[in-house]
Amino acid sequence: MMSQQDLPTLFYSGKSNSAVPIISESELQTITAEPWLEISKKGLQLEGLNFDRQGQLFLLDVFEGNIFKVNPETKEIKRPFVSHKANPAAIKIHKDGRLFICYLGDFKSTGGIFAATENGDNIQDIIEDLSTEYCIDDMVFDSKGGFYFTDFRGYSTNPLGGVYYVTPDFKTVTPIIQNISVANGIALSTDEKVLWVTETTANRLHRIALEDDGVTIQPFGATIPYYFTGHEGPDSCCIDSDDNLYVAMYGQGRVLVFNKRGYPIGQILIPSRDEGHMLRSTHPQFIPGTNQLIICSNDIEMDGGSMLYTVNGFAKGHKSYQFQ
């Protein structure tokens, strides 16, 4: 009889020695991001990276509602205003310069979208929380000035979320896909024929091929090309000019990159992720006219700060609606 001391034994080594081990994607091209700017020494839930026509970076802090403005050249950080709505989650910029801010409200039924100037003035309700039940996490404009948004409701066994399209006059809301679990990140391909959506609590990536009207799904056009692993799941995303998709992995301290067909082709790691630091990676975004990618993350669980990191992506960022 073999003694317990002589039995085969599992040890924490190699990949299993990480707080957030990478197994299925370990053979992908992998790079580690460099620190770019510390937003705060406090752990803030940073989100919503977006650049305006002048190249200024806007982002926000979900739980405290701070709207930040960063000058990429001087690294000066300003706080032009604080959201009057609870739990803002994304900033997108209209061609007219206004900030469109998605907010989650009570995370159940009081989310919406409001527009404001970069100083927080001239507030206009776009999707009003009092007349809808959406919990809006993110949005993306098309070239006509309409937009798609994600409904962040539900959980893994109660999929209440979905994706909707709002016409350029902001008067008509059309469902695109429904019955998904916490719809989160959203991106539109360069030709506006493919909509990408991340489903956080089900760990799935949706690829939705659209007809010319932008709301009808092509026959067999709604597919799930990728299932993620680990806790927590896919978050916000963006595309580059080659139609590659960059998906931040919340709770994992990394960004996964997919080609236009949904195959993983690379990943970007946040420093110290193996030790459990800076795992709350939420949003990648390109500096306009370059292939330089900015990624936000924070270290709330480890009592650390809030950072922006940077790498070069595969291609230059897509020239989105606010630059057209």
Swiss-Prot record:
GO MF term list: hydrolase activity; metal ion binding
Cellular localisation: Cytoplasm
Assigned keywords, A-Z: Calcium, Cytoplasm, Hydrolase, Metal-binding
Leading EC class: hydrolase
Cofactor note as given: Binds 2 Ca(2+) ions per subunit.
InterPro entries referenced in this protein's UniProt entry, alphabetically: 6-blade_b-propeller_TolB-like, SGL, SMP-30/CGR1_Lactonase
Catalytic activity, EC: 3.1.1.-
Cofactor: Ca(2+)
Residue positions binding Ca(2+) 1: E47, D137, N184, D235, S236
Domain of life according to the entry: Bacteria
Physiological role: Exhibits lactonase activity. Acts in cells with perturbed membrane integrity and is possibly related to the membrane homeostasis.
Protein name: Lactonase drp35
Organism: Staphylococcus aureus (strain MRSA252)
Gene behind this protein: drp35
